[in-house]
């Protein structure tokens, strides 16, 4: 069983720069057809300072943590039994190419179902920009199958 004493545990914050080339690649890979995601002139015409961050791109940047497996390692979770359970995004402000975003992760909850056959770890991540403005809150649920 996962140790519930880790609920509330925070990981070291880390920062990542939003790069234009990666935004364009992500927009193309996810089928974004609005030119504001790939053409800087179109973005400026639309009133943006630069290319806007497409939906869900923050998950990619979150994976740039110095140790993306830190929470799983901390809890001793076996990779062979992990499933991606759920993911959600709450946006508070837009982010753009050139921004430096800071990610602060915390274990928000640990619980089980089916008599412990399934254990769930809820991670919440606050994302803020270089002006310390809250950009988004990410919620990820990882499921561990036991037995």
Give the residues covered by each predicted segment.
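Short alpha-helix capping/helix-loop boundary micro-motifs
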Residues: 86-90
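Hot-dog-fold acyl-thioester-processing enzymes
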Residues: 1-84
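HotDog/MaoC-like acyl-thioester-processing domains
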Residues: 1-2, 91-147
């Amino acid at each position: 069983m996962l140790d519930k004493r880790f609920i509330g545990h925070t990981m070291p914050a880390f920062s990542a720069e939003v790069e234009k080339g990666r935004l364009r690649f992500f927009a193309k890979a996810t089928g974004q057809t609005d030119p504001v995601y790939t053409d800087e002139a179109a973005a400026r015409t639309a009133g943006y300072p630069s290319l806007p961050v497409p939906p869900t791109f923050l998950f990619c940047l979150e994976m740039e943590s110095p140790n993306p497996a830190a929470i799983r390692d901390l809890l001793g979770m076996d990779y062979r039994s992990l499933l991606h359970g759920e993911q959600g995004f709450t946006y508070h402000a837009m982010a753009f190419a050139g921004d430096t975003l800071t990610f602060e992760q915390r274990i928000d909850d640990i619980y089980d179902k089916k008599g412990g056959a399934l254990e769930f770890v809820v991670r919440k991540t606050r994302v803020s920009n270089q002006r310390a403005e809250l950009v988004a809150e990410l919620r990820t649920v990882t499921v561990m199958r036991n037995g």
